[in-house]
Amino acid sequence: MVMIKMSDVDLFNKRILIRADLNVPIRNGIITSARRIHASLPTIQLALSRSNQVMVTSHLGRPVEGEYDSQFSLQPVVDYFQKNLSAKIGGVRLVKDYLDGINWISNELLILENVRFNKGEKTDDEVLAKKYASLCDVFVMDAFGSAHRIQSSTHNVSKFVKVACSGLLLEQEIAALHKALSNPVRPMVAIVGGSKVSSKLMVLESLSKVVDYLIVGGGIANTFLAAQGQNVGKSLYEAELISTAKSLLKDCNIPIPTDVRVSSEFSETAQSIMKNVTEIKDDEQILDLGDNSIINILNILNNAKTILWNGPVGVFEFPNFRKGTEMVSNAIANSNAFSIAGGGDTLMAIDLFGIANQISYVSTGGGAFLEFIEGKTLPSIEVLEEHKRMRNGNYSDINY
């Protein structure tokens, strides 16, 4: 992937617009995980070290497009910057109305309000994209988590700015995924959990071609158990994808659980019963791995040199069905392998077990992370590549 890098651009005293991913979880006005904010900091700090006209914008949640809704405002993000990061970035101000121009106050970082409040954002509207472009001399795409979205602030804006480049976080994300997928040190192990095979079918098919072991968990594993003829009771599984699961089992080394933890009810207080997979009753549902299955996975992980992790292997939100995900998480954390993890539930598990600093790279992407693994071209990256081709390498001496 060949894009103009932020580090290659003359940023001195330029108007810089950074499209970051500040889509953080917020409860009662309080940010519950600031991981994405901190991941964006290096790019913001680099911009501030070169210019006193730096703007950052992002989406947050899913408001009705074109309508202001205070519950989706970036104000809590601004508050977080002011309270926790002022020593690193200085003053911060939220700007609500910015499409027709901005009144600058020197040495302030401007946070431009939620882009999804702007009509046309989600349809990649060119008129809106041109308004974004008019605000800046340099556009920095740093929102890997939104790189799969064809929207005005992530895609079309790059067609109309003088210089469009990749931010530090975007470069790190791509480099980490390339390291895991393009030339992995072997053995390579992928862990794919979640509720449905259908939602991760292309991921499973892509990974089956490159990994040495493909570990499946959650509802995905249930479909593979059913493909082997096991009764999965009232567990979540997809009967229509049993033939697909059988095909994957032939093409890839997929260790299927031999024992599981089940319950007759789905609740936080449900009793956990460990059983061989041949003993599951019709009124029971699989909610976690059993001890022998966990040991088998740990043995595989202990020998791995590259680990890609997306999704829990059980209902880890319930304490009685947390063991599988916790043991797998700790094994990855304690491994000497290069490890990369991504996806919303995966990040929740990483935070719950406090292992973020022990994973080689924790991706900020969810959908973008999965689509990259699938081998899809991410639109925001594609347009940055096209922008560089259009510039033909001549971007350092542009008259801003």
Curated annotation (Swiss-Prot):
<dbReference type="GO" id="GO:0043531">
    <property type="term" value="F:ADP binding"/>
</dbReference>
<dbReference type="InterPro" id="IPR015824">
    <property type="entry name" value="Phosphoglycerate_kinase_N"/>
</dbReference>
<keyword id="KW-0067">ATP-binding</keyword>
<keyword id="KW-0418">Kinase</keyword>
<dbReference type="GO" id="GO:0005524">
    <property type="term" value="F:ATP binding"/>
</dbReference>
<dbReference type="GO" id="GO:0006094">
    <property type="term" value="P:gluconeogenesis"/>
</dbReference>
<keyword id="KW-0808">Transferase</keyword>
<comment type="pathway">
    <text>Carbohydrate degradation; glycolysis; pyruvate from D-glyceraldehyde 3-phosphate: step 2/5.</text>
</comment>
<dbReference type="InterPro" id="IPR036043">
    <property type="entry name" value="Phosphoglycerate_kinase_sf"/>
</dbReference>
<protein>
    <recommendedName>
        <fullName>Phosphoglycerate kinase</fullName>
        <ecNumber>2.7.2.3</ecNumber>
    </recommendedName>
</protein>
<feature type="binding site">
    <location>
        <position position="116"/>
    </location>
    <ligand>
        <name>substrate</name>
    </ligand>
</feature>
<feature type="binding site">
    <location>
        <position position="149"/>
    </location>
    <ligand>
        <name>substrate</name>
    </ligand>
</feature>
<keyword id="KW-0324">Glycolysis</keyword>
<dbReference type="Pfam" id="PF00162">
    <property type="entry name" value="PGK"/>
</dbReference>
<dbReference type="GO" id="GO:0004618">
    <property type="term" value="F:phosphoglycerate kinase activity"/>
</dbReference>
<comment type="similarity">
    <text>Belongs to the phosphoglycerate kinase family.</text>
</comment>
<feature type="binding site">
    <location>
        <position position="200"/>
    </location>
    <ligand>
        <name>ATP</name>
    </ligand>
</feature>
<comment type="subunit">
    <text>Monomer.</text>
</comment>
<feature type="binding site">
    <location>
        <position position="36"/>
    </location>
    <ligand>
        <name>substrate</name>
    </ligand>
</feature>
<dbReference type="InterPro" id="IPR001576">
    <property type="entry name" value="Phosphoglycerate_kinase"/>
</dbReference>
<keyword id="KW-0963">Cytoplasm</keyword>
<dbReference type="GO" id="GO:0005829">
    <property type="term" value="C:cytosol"/>
</dbReference>
<keyword id="KW-0547">Nucleotide-binding</keyword>
<feature type="binding site">
    <location>
        <begin position="21"/>
        <end position="23"/>
    </location>
    <ligand>
        <name>substrate</name>
    </ligand>
</feature>
<feature type="binding site">
    <location>
        <begin position="59"/>
        <end position="62"/>
    </location>
    <ligand>
        <name>substrate</name>
    </ligand>
</feature>
<dbReference type="GO" id="GO:0006096">
    <property type="term" value="P:glycolytic process"/>
</dbReference>
<feature type="binding site">
    <location>
        <position position="317"/>
    </location>
    <ligand>
        <name>ATP</name>
    </ligand>
</feature>
<feature type="binding site">
    <location>
        <begin position="343"/>
        <end position="346"/>
    </location>
    <ligand>
        <name>ATP</name>
    </ligand>
</feature>
